[in-house]
Amino acid sequence: MASVKDLEPYASNEPGLVDVLLDFKATMPNPIVFKVVGYQALTFEDVTQGDALYSRASDGKVGKAVANGTLDEATVAGFAETTVTSGNRVRAIVSGQVPTSQTLDAGDLFFLSATQAGRVVKTPPSTAGQYVTPVGEAANTNELIVRIKRPILLR
């Protein structure tokens, strides 16, 4: 056991930080899992892979979120991992990376759409009474890095 170096503390300087990062990289799973956090929920309408979802307060079922409705409808509760029909279970991804049927521009920030339920847009809503709900950043042309924030009501 005297030869085991893994348990020794890292130096509190730049080489120590580099050692920490190298060890961290060496212990990461391969491939890295991007769909980190999600949950199963029943849908009350048809949803398409990548749709932004909200949870209906009356029964907890999920459907397409939209920024021009109520606070509940503008509060994104996750993104549909797959396409399902009404009454079926869908996995809602709340953290990580999710494929979408939309064409995205890598690196751009996205917001919940006020005109198309379930969709995301680069330009946030700007009309009084609508909500601005930041939802994430495009990883590439068809995947969104999920970073859901609370909706902000425009006045």
Task: Describe the residue ranges of each PLM region.
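Glycine-anchored, exposed beta-strand/edge motif detector
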Residues: 2-9, 29-155
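A signal for long, low-complexity, Ser/Thr/Asn-enriched, surface-exposed stalk/shaft
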Residues: 14-29
